[in-house]
Amino acid sequence: MGSGTGEEPATNKRLPVRGVAGVSCLLMTHFKKIQLVSFVSIFAFAGFASGQQNAGMKPEETEIWTPVPAVVTPGATDAAPPSDAIVLFDGKSLDQWVNAQTGAPAEWIVGDGILTVKKGPGIGNIQTKRTFKNYQLHVEWRIPENITGSGQARGNSGVFLASTGPNDDGYELQVLDSYNNLTYVNGQAGAIYKENPPLVNPNRKPGEWQTYNIVWTAPTFNEDGSLKSPAYVTAFMNGMLVQNHFQLIGQTLFIGKPYYKKYDRAPIKLQAHGDKSEPISFRNIWVRELP
């Protein structure tokens, strides 16, 4: 029965729509606060548990004594090879290199402590006699002061970190005159060719020596040829980081998308590019094998 006033009892009144929304908002806010407090509590407990785990430990329990790192004598300068390095070019001979296509002795030009690309039919790329897996590589290169051409036809070459075939097969760190020379960014000096541009452009003027210091982690493969772990490269150019542990997506290709092809160990290759510009030079090439 009614109250005689014609109004519903206060206890039976419905909340206005705004009131319902407000209550919902209030409940959600409280719920989020509870969640936040819960997460904070969990992390605090984890930190407390870790602290408890370390309670009573002695400093000696986290000391590692073996195996003892090998003693390596550094070079007299940062550019000089350390005592455990394999010198690939000592400024005197090409004893460590062969023609990448034929396996015959390399025919590039050696003089005044410098190795210069020799262009011409049947000469082509050169690669190391030795094969490598993971390593640290030092190489210096120079674009001629009188360089001509533009874009990719201006001092083009490359350091192939793993040569997987006789021509331009493999994984290339680009060499090019990129001092005021416009080209696609994943094709300029310091780029993993057609895969990743350099982080910065630290190129010096033509006629000045440039330096690459490279750490190469080779890809590994399963028995069926499928990829087990990808290749990684870290590279410094003239002391500046240009590739930061970049994960390659396959071999570097001029045309098409990169892909992996199974190999175990591979030579390091230097490219004799077919452009008509003046040939570039290299010096002071050494490598340290890594685990």
Language model segments and positions:
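Bacterial N-terminal signal peptides
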Residues: V37-G47
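Intrinsic low-complexity/disordered segments
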Residues: K13, L27, K32, A49-S50, ...
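Serine/threonine-rich, low-complexity intrinsically disordered segments
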Residues: E7, N12-K13, F31, L36, ...
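Residue-level detector of alpha-helix boundary/anchor positions
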Residues: S3-G4, S41, P81
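N-terminal amphipathic/basic-hydrophobic helices that include classical n-h-c signal peptides
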Residues: M1-L27, A231
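Bacterial N-terminal signal peptides that target proteins for export
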Residues: V23-F39
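Carbohydrate-interacting regions of secretory-pathway proteins
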Residues: A49-P291
